A protein has these predicted regions:
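Bacterial N-terminal signal peptides
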Residues: 17-24
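A structural boundary/capping signal
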Residues: 26-176
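Intrinsically disordered low-complexity regions specifically enriched for long asparagine
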Residues: 15-16, 30
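N-terminal secretory signal peptides that target proteins for export/translocation
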Residues: 1-11
C-alpha cells in the first residue's frame, strides 16, 4: 500500500513539474511589436503573407458600424488585434507599405457606394503600375492584392465585376 502511495506521489510530482515547465515555456515566447515586425519586412510580399495568414475580418465590428465610418484603429492596434474592417486594413496597409518602402507611395482609396456604405482599400505603386490591397472585406472574391491597373477607374471596373453584392460604384478617389 505504501509503495502505491509513493508511486502516486511521484507521479503527481512529475506531472506538476511538467505542467510548470510547460507554463514557463509558454510565457517565454517573445511577442514582437508592430515596429519590430515591420522593420524585418523587406517587400509588400511580407505584408501580404502576414495579412493572409494572421489578419482576420472583424465581423462583429463590421456589424456594429455597418453603414457608418467607425473610429479607425492605428496600425499598431490593428497589428496587435490581428483583425479589423475595411478602414483598419487600409490604414494598416498604407502605413506599413510606406515604412517598408516609401517608393510604394501607398495611399488610401475610397470607393463611393450608392447608399452610403463606402469601401476603403490601399493603393500602391510598383514599377510605375498601380496595385490595390484589400483585406478589409468578408468577400473572398476581392480579398488580396490586385493589379496591375493603369488607373483607379480600371480597378473600379474590376471591383464592380468581382464584388458579389456591389455592382455599381458611384465614384473612386484617393482619400485626402
Amino acid at each position: 500500500m505504501d509503495s502505491q502511495l509513493n508511486q502516486a506521489r511521484k507521479l503527481k510530482t512529475k506531472a506538476l513539474l511538467i505542467f510548470l515547465l510547460f507554463l514557463s515555456g509558454c510565457a517565454m515566447i517573445p511577442v514582437r511589436s508592430y515596429d519590430e515586425t515591420v522593420s524585418r519586412w523587406k517587400t509588400h510580399k511580407d505584408l501580404e503573407k502576414w495579412m493572409a495568414k494572421d489578419f482576420s475580418f472583424d465581423t462583429e465590428r463590421f456589424r456594429r458600424f455597418e453603414g457608418t465610418l467607425p473610429p479607425p484603429r492605428t496600425p499598431e492596434e490593428t497589428f496587435k488585434l490581428k483583425s479589423g474592417i475595411y478602414i483598419d486594413a487600409a490604414i494598416f496597409a498604407k502605413a506599413t507599405l510606406n515604412r517598408i518602402d516609401p517608393s510604394y507611395r501607398a495611399k488610401i482609396v475610397v470607393l463611393l457606394i450608392p447608399g452610403g456604405a463606402n469601401h476603403y482599400v490601399c493603393s500602391f505603386k510598383m514599377d510605375g503600375r498601380l496595385f490595390i490591397m484589400d483585406y478589409g472585406t468578408p468577400y473572398q472574391s476581392i480579398v488580396g492584392v490586385h493589379g496591375p491597373f493603369n488607373s483607379l477607374e480600371e480597378y473600379k471596373l474590376f471591383f464592380e465585376k468581382n464584388h458579389p453584392t456591389i455592382k455599381r460604384v458611384q465614384a473612386i478617389t484617393y482619400l485626402r
